């Protein structure tokens, strides 16, 4: 079996989901954000390029506006996300600054990466920010994204967005933090004997079939979108680690080669 070795990894995209940022009671998980900021700042100080793709605008918005559930009306959803995005970035900026790290905000819609000119502009922005030692924090621009057939500008969810960001920035590794330990051979919430897959070298039909089901009440991404993200990463000859986000310091252990989560990597020659 292939051995994990991330010594040559220079550019890392980390994706954190709403379930890792917002607690079950709807309150923001400050401890986790602090850990994440510490880890990313430590890696930046070692010369790595870091990009964070962060969900959570809706969760932050619901908390600030004291709403206990996501509105069903699209315009209201966009309003709540818009409020939450400001709060989320404010908190990120504050906490990252404790570790002498500056952050920036990049809000994307799908059409930005489809058109060559806007894609070149956003790619240049990423490169400039990282050259200045700044950590770009990326989210979908929920207030203007639409999902209509004639003008679809949504990525679908931030799992797929993180794979797109990894592609356009030519990242060496995508680390996806989730509320699960990785990819299992069957659903661990149903089957007690479900086994965690340490490595996946090929996305088979069987894996896709076993990855049904949706996400948490605050987020949108389920296991299927993570598998689709891995497919996108493979299409660009990249690699991805899917791991539990409950302890962001585990990112450092993963990069040391510890077998945490599921490592998606193609065998040489594929």
Swiss-Prot record:
Tell me the keywords, alphabetical order: Amino-acid biosynthesis, ATP-binding, Cytoplasm, Kinase, Nucleotide-binding, Proline biosynthesis, Transferase
Cellular component GO terms, alphabetical? cytosol
Matching SUPFAM superfamilies, A to Z? Carbamate kinase-like (SSF53633)
Q: Where in the cell is it found?
A: Cytoplasm
Q: Which GO terms describe its molecular function?
A: ATP binding; glutamate 5-kinase activity
Reaction catalysis annotation: L-glutamate + ATP = L-glutamyl 5-phosphate + ADP
- The protein's role, per its UniProt record: Catalyzes the transfer of a phosphate group to glutamate to form L-glutamate 5-phosphate.
Q: State the name under which the record lists this protein.
A: Glutamate 5-kinase
User: What gene, per UniProt, encodes this protein?
Assistant: proB
């Amino acid at each position: 079996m292939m051995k994990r070795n991330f010594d040559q990894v220079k550019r890392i995209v980390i994706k954190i989901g709403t379930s890792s940022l917002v607690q079950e009671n709807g309150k923001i998980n400050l401890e986790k954000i602090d850990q994440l900021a510490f880890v990313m700042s430590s890696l930046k100080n070692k010369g790595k390029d870091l990009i964070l793709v962060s969900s959570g605008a809706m969760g932050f918005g619901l908390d600030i506006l004291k709403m206990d559930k996501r509105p069903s009306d699209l315009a209201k959803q966009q309003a709540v996300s818009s409020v939450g995005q400001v709060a989320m970035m404010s908190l990120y900026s504050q906490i990252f600054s404790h570790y002498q790290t500056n952050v920036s905000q990049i809000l994307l819609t799908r059409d930005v990466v489809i058109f060559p000119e806007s894609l070149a502009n956003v790619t240049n922005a990423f490169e400039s920010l990282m050259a200045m030692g700044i950590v770009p924090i990326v989210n979908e621009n929920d207030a203007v994204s639409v999902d209509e057939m004639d003008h679809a500008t949504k990525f679908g969810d931030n799992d797929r967005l993180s794979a797109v960001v990894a592609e356009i920035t030519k990242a060496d590794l995508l680390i996806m933090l989730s509320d699960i330990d990785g990819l299992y051979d069957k659903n661990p919430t149903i089957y007690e004997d479900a086994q965690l897959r340490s490595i996946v070298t090929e996305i088979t039909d069987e894996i896709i079939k076993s990855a049904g089901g949706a996400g948490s009440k605050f987020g949108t991404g389920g296991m299927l979108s993570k598998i689709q993200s891995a497919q996108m990463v493979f299409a660009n000859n990249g690699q991805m680690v899917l791991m539990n986000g409950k302890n962001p310091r585990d990112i450092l252990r993963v990069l040391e080669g510890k077998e945490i989560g599921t490592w998606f990597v193609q065998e040489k020659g594929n």
